[in-house]
Amino acid sequence: IHPEYFVTADGEMYFGEVAYRPPGFKAFELIERAYGFNAYQASMLVFDPKSTKEEVDGFFPREVVDAKGYAGCFGVYPRRRVVSKLEMPKETIEHPYFESHELIAPTEETVPDRSAFGTHWGLVFFFGDDPIKMRDLLKAQEELDFYV
């Protein structure tokens, strides 16, 4: 069980929900991509009362030092009220940090109002070696149309 909060473009933080599942928005997958260990296994290890401190310490990589790079994902929600197809922006798919996406073609043309700050139609995944480039890349996705 964990709370989820969302930060808007103007820096305001809003409560989203209390979720009864592992942390959302692919956080564990992003951690695994950056550090190369399974965060789901780690969560079971740290909650197991029989785990020793040595086992826990030996499982985790060293923070920052052992990272292979920077992993990020962007939650896509259409910027238009009416869409007919998925069209991946050239700026996204040709960027060297682009890895994959989970977006699918729209099933209806009218885009409903967002029901929550975390509502998205799918995720786009990135991985690279420069945190500033990653930050700027993720921010730039806000201005692109994935659904037209």
Functional labels for PLM-detected ranges:
Residues L103-V148:
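Generic C-terminus detector
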Residues V76-T107:
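Glycine-rich active-site loop/lid that clamps phosphate-bearing ligands
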Residues F60-V64, P89-E91, E109-S115:
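Short proline/glycine-enriched turn/loop segments at secondary-structure junctions
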Residues Y14-E17:
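Protein kinase-like catalytic core scaffold
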Residues I1-G11:
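Internal nucleotide-binding/catalytic subdomain
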